[in-house]
């Protein structure tokens, strides 16, 4: 399996028009890479671990701003269900000593994620907020409203809200994804200039108790 081989198929699943949370789940393995470029290149050339766990789609996100430590990044895998994601976590233990990987990265932790709003899986330039929410359903609804308003304003920004499962101290994730940094910056500029969709963003924060952190990532 090549990274992102089944991207279109999984995107179709996550975009099904249903009232409950969309299907699918993700896992992330957070690491400290000794050399980010070398680690990513190694994974692209050695896809056996991804094939072994049976993920539908796989990729990486590299933290570019707001880092908690040098070389901060994670490897993500997408599945058709939480069940599949949980089963996959039993097939591969990243904590097991591996001489090849030990030279390239240090494992921090792993998490399973459930998307709680429709989300088009098209990685790119991504702003990530780690949030403590008091009503995740209401917050997700606000993000649906905001995404529609952004599209009406001519912006191609995909918003994802993700519920952590077995994540230790992890909290909810909000991702705002664009194809380029320029597109993301334009949305932010318009917000501070008083764009009407900014009111939806501001209103959504009644459901946020705390912004734990905010980072910028480049994903593929």
Q: Could you tell me what each predicted segment is?
A:
Residues 4-16:
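Sec-dependent N-terminal signal peptides
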Residues 19-220:
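Short S/T/G/P-rich N-terminal loop/turn motif that feeds into the first structured element of a domain
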């Amino acid at each position: 399996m090549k990274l992102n081989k089944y991207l279109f198929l999984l995107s179709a699943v996550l975009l099904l028009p249903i009232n409950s949370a969309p299907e699918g789940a993700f896992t992330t393995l957070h690491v400290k890479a000794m050399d980010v470029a070398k680690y990513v290149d190694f994974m692209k050339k050695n896809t056996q671990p991804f094939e072994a766990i049976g993920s539908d789609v796989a990729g990486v996100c590299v933290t570019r701003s707001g880092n908690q430590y040098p070389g901060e990044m994670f490897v993500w895998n997408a599945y058709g269900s939480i069940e599949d994601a949980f089963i996959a976590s039993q097939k591969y233990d990243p904590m097991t000593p591996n001489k090849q990987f030990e030279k390239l990265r240090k494992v921090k932790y792993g998490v399973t994620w459930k998307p709680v709003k429709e989300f088009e899986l098209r990685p790119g330039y991504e702003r990530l907020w780690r949030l403590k929410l008091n009503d995740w359903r209401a917050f997700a609804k606000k993000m649906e409203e905001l995404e529609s308003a952004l599209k009406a304003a001519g912006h191609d920004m995909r918003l994802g809200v993700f519920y952590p499962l077995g994540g230790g101290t992890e909290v909810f994730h909000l991702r705002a994804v664009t194809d380029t940094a320029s597109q993301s910056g334009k949305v932010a500029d318009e917000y501070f200039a008083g764009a009407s969709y900014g009111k939806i963003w501001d209103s959504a924060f009644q459901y946020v108790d705390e912004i734990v952190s905010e980072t910028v990532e480049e994903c593929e």
